[in-house]
Amino acid sequence: MKVLYINPNINHHKLPFYDALRNIYGQDNVIYATPLIHEENRIKMGFDSYQQENWLYHIQPSNFTEFSNLFYEADIVLCSIRDYYRLMEKRLQSGKLTFYFSERWFKEGIGKFRLLHPKILNLVYQFRKLSTYPNFFYLAQGEYAAYDFNYLG
């Protein structure tokens, strides 16, 4: 069973979960994919850059077709990048197990006023559509994230 774990960056808080997936499904069966290999401010704070890791797949415009194939062919996809909703929908249409996880949609400050922005409104529409598939699951990263997604319907 092949698992694709997609995050916007490498986060030391999420690596234990990734390691647990590798222990369950096998070292060679789980790929960590990210468009941002390292953030300069994290490296300055002493975090590893992870650039040389063979388990890491760097998503770039030059390999996006290959990445899309990995996305469609994986048995399980866990994704936290909202902009990949079209890729998620294609997987869902073919009955593949797809998880989306996120933090809050409506963080303090602007909050629900974000819904007035056309891009956010479109994302809400897309994720409401995705949530109608029986093989789509939302994993809330915190109580407020669950509240926000529940608010969207």
Region roles according to the model:
Residues 1-53, 72-74:
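N-terminal subdomain of nucleotide-sugar transferases
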Residues 40-43, 108-115:
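Short, charged, surface-exposed secondary-structure boundary motifs
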Residues 49-68, 83-84:
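Glycine-rich, highly charged phosphate/nucleotide-binding loops
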Residues 76, 91-111, 139:
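Active-site proximal beta-strand in glycosyltransferases
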Residues 79-85, 102-103:
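Short His-centered aromatic/hydrophobic patch
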Residues 83-84, 144-146:
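Alpha-helix capping/helix-boundary segments
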Residues 106, 117-138, 147, 151-152:
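Membrane-proximal helix-turn-helix segments that form the acceptor-binding/catalytic region
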